[in-house]
Amino acid sequence: MGEQNVIRLRGVTIYHTDDPFGSRSEKKLLQQGELILSDLNFDINAGEFVYLIGRVGSGKSSLLKTLYAELQLIEGEGYVAGFDLRKLKRREIPMLRRRIGIVFQDYQLLTDRNVFMNLYYVMKATGWKNESEIRKRIDEVLKLSLIHISEPTR
């Protein structure tokens, strides 16, 4: 993994299964689970903000849960903040989660805070120190969100 890559995925395929940390048997998953995402390949570098936008059921949350080690990576190579998702031990999960920030669209937000403050807390918790840079980055993300919301659907 390159030094600038915070996230690197190669050939990642994600299945929905009722047993996310159970058997690594692909055959079992194919019999029990539904294919969600296939052959993902991408890098996210340090300092980049990334949006996952797609239809309901397209695999956005499954991908985030895999990156956040809530779902186990079964197929492909995945590295997050220097951790190999295929070899991640349970005791390493909190360390991984302290190194990245993921904001879910709904159920995992701090309900007594607005979107700005949810993003702010993630950035502070992951080591961002410069207040003006934090505010600038969050403002950029929020402006992109408002542009997306204000565009008519086709």
Where are these regions (language model features)?
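The feature captures the beta-strand-to-loop junction immediately N-terminal to the Walker
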Residues: 53-55
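ABC ATPase NBD coupling module
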Residues: 85-101, 131
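Conserved beta-strand
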Residues: 9-12, 24-45, 76
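Helix-to-loop junction immediately C-terminal to a conserved catalytic motif
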Residues: 68
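Conserved ABC ATPase "signature" region
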Residues: 83-84, 132-150
